[in-house]
C-alpha cells in the first residue's frame, strides 16, 4: 500500500478507566507527530459505556485531544427489535465508510472482542463493495479479551465463540499482544481449542503473534516541578511521603481488599495514610470494608482524580501498592500503572508477580505473594523505612527501565513492520 495518511484506532476510549484507553490516546498523539494527517478514534457513545457499567472518569476531568485527532462515537443502527447489536452495527458501518474511500489507512484494534471482530466484519463488507480499499490492519490482544471470552468459551464448550475471536484475530495483517505473558496465554488458549476440535489456531498464533508493550506518555511524569507537586498534594490534604498509594480500577482482581487489611496491620499507619484512587465495580464494598477497619480514619478514597493530577500523586507517595491477583475473569497482563509509577519516580512499588506484571516491573519492585495482607504490611513497612538515598537510586533504575514503554518508542516498534518507509517525525 502507499504510505498511510490515516490511522483509525478502535478501542474503549475515554472516559473509560482503563490503561488501554490511555494507550489509544498516546498512540493517536504519536501518530500526529509521525506524520499521519488524519487520526481517528472510533469508540462507543458515552451513554452506552455508562449502561455497560464500566468504571468511568468524571467527564470534566478528561483531557482534550490534540487538533487532528477526531473521536467518533457512532450512533446505534436499528431500533428495539435489534436487542444487542445496534451499537456494534454503528461502529462496523462507520469503519466500512472509512475503509472504502481509497485513503491509505492503518486500522489498529485494541481488544479482540468486539473491536477486532468489528474490523474483520467491516473489511469483509468493504471488499465486497468493489470500492477502493487501501487498509492495513493491526490487532492488539490485551489479555482480558482472552481470559474473559476465549477461555470462558472453551470452559463452556462453545467452540464457535472461541473460533470467532481467534479467526478474526488471525485475519488481521499484524497480530500483537501487550506482553510475553499475554502471547503465551493466547497460544495456550488456542491450543485448548485445537485439542478439542482438531483446529490449528495455536500454531498460527505461535508463528504470527508479536509483542507490543502498552504505549505510555512519559512526558507528564518526568521532571515534575517540585513546588507544583507540593501544591497538588496540599489541595488533597496530603504531604510528600505521608501516604501509601493505590491507583487503579476498584475491582476484585486488583487486591484492594488485601491492601486495606495489610495497611491496618502495618506499623507505617502510625505516620501514613492509605490513599485509594479509582472507580470500579467493587467501590461500595471496599468503602464499607475500609469504614469497618480500625484504620478507617487513615483511609481516603478519591474518585475524581483526572489524568493531569495522577503523576503528582504518584510522585509524592511513600509507596505504591498494586497487589493484583489472578481471577477467572481477569489477570493483570501487563501493569500499566506500575510503569507509570516508575516514570513518576515516587516511592517504591509493591506488587505481586502474577500475569505480566514482572515484565512491567523489570525487577525494580518488591514482589509479594498474592492474597497475603501480612506480606503487604511487611513490604509497606520496609518501603517507608528505606533510606532516602536508596529510594532515589531505586527510582532512577526503575525509571530507566520504564522509559522503554514511552509512546514514541512503542509506536515506532509497532509501525516498523507496517510503514513502507521510516516514519517522518513531525516538526
Model regions and ranges:
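Conserved acidic donor-binding segment of nucleotide-sugar-dependent glycosyltransferases
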Residues: 351, 363-374, 382-388
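Acidic donor-binding loop of glycosyltransferase active sites
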Residues: 315-330, 347
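Donor nucleotide-sugar binding/catalytic pocket of nucleotide-sugar-dependent glycosyltransferases
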Residues: 136-139, 162-231, 300
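Conserved donor-binding/catalytic core segment of Leloir-type glycosyltransferases
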Residues: 176, 216-218, 233, 237-254, ...
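Short hydrophobic beta-strand element within catalytic cores of glycosyltransferases
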Residues: 338, 343-351
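A charged, aromatic-enriched C-terminal amphipathic alpha-helix characteristic of glycosyltransferases
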Residues: 254, 371, 388-420
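Nucleotide-sugar donor phosphate/pyrophosphate-binding loop at the beta->alpha transition
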Residues: 123-140, 144-168, 191-197
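Nucleotide-activated donor-binding/catalytic signature segment of Leloir-type glycosyltransferases, i.e.
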Residues: 123, 284-309
Amino acid at each position: 500500500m502507499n504510505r498511510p495518511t490515516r490511522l483509525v484506532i478502535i478501542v474503549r476510549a475515554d472516559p473509560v478507566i482503563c490503561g488501554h484507553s490511555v494507550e489509544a490516546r498516546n498512540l493517536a498523539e504519536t501518530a500526529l507527530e509521525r506524520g499521519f494527517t488524519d487520526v481517528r478514534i472510533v469508540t462507543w457513545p458515552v451513554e452506552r459505556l455508562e449502561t455497560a457499567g464500566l468504571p468511568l472518569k468524571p467527564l470534566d476531568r478528561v483531557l482534550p485531544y490534540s487538533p487532528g485527532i477526531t473521536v467518533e462515537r457512532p450512533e446505534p443502527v436499528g431500533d428495539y427489535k435489534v436487542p444487542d447489536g445496534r451499537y456494534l452495527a454503528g461502529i462496523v458501518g462507520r469503519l466500512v465508510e472509512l475503509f472504502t474511500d481509497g485513503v491509505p489507512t492503518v486500522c489498529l484494534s485494541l481488544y479482540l472482542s468486539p473491536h477486532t471482530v468489528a474490523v474483520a466484519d467491516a473489511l469483509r463488507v468493504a471488499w465486497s463493495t468493489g470500492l477502493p480499499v487501501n487498509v492495513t490492519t493491526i490487532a492488539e490482544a490485551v489479555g482480558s479479551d482472552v481470559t474473559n471470552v476465549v477461555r470462558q468459551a472453551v470452559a463452556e464448550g462453545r467452540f464457535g465463540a472461541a473460533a470467532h475471536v481467534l479467526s478474526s484475530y488471525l485475519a488481521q495483517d499484524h497480530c500483537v499482544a501487550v506482553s510475553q505473558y499475554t502471547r503465551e496465554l493466547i497460544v495456550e488458549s488456542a491450543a485448548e481449542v485445537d485439542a478439542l476440535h482438531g483446529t490449528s489456531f495455536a500454531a498460527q498464533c505461535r508463528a504470527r503473534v508479536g509483542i507490543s508493550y502498552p504505549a505510555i506518555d512519559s512526558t507528564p511524569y518526568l521532571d515534575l516541578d517540585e513546588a507544583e507537586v507540593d501544591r497538588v498534594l496540599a489541595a488533597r490534604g496530603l504531604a510528600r511521603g505521608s501516604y501509601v498509594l493505590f491507583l487503579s480500577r476498584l475491582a476484585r482482581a486488583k487486591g484492594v481488599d488485601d491492601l486495606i487489611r495489610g495497611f491496618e496491620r502495618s506499623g507505617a499507619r502510625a505516620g501514613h495514610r492509605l490513599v485509594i484512587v479509582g472507580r470500579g465495580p467493587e467501590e461500595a464494598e471496599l468503602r464499607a470494608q475500609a469504614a469497618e477497619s480500625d484504620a478507617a480514619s487513615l483511609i481516603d478514597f478519591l474518585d475524581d482524580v483526572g489524568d493531569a493530577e495522577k503523576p503528582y500523586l504518584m510522585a509524592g507517595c511513600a509507596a505504591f501498592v498494586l497487589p493484583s491477583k489472578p481471577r477467572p475473569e481477569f489477570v493483570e497482563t501487563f501493569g500499566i500503572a506500575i510503569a507509570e509509577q516508575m516514570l513518576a519516580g515516587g516511592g517504591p512499588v509493591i506488587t505481586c508477580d502474577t500475569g505480566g506484571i514482572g515484565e512491567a516491573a523489570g525487577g525494580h519492585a518488591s514482589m509479594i505473594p498474592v492474597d497475603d495482607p501480612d506480606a503487604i504490611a511487611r513490604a509497606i513497612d520496609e518501603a517507608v523505612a528505606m533510606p532516602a538515598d536508596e529510594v532515589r537510586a531505586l527510582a532512577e533504575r526503575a525509571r530507566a527501565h520504564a522509559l522503554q514503554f514511552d509512546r514514541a518508542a512503542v509506536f515506532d516498534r509497532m509501525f516498523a513492520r507496517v510503514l513502507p518507509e521510516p516514519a517522518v517525525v513531525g516538526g
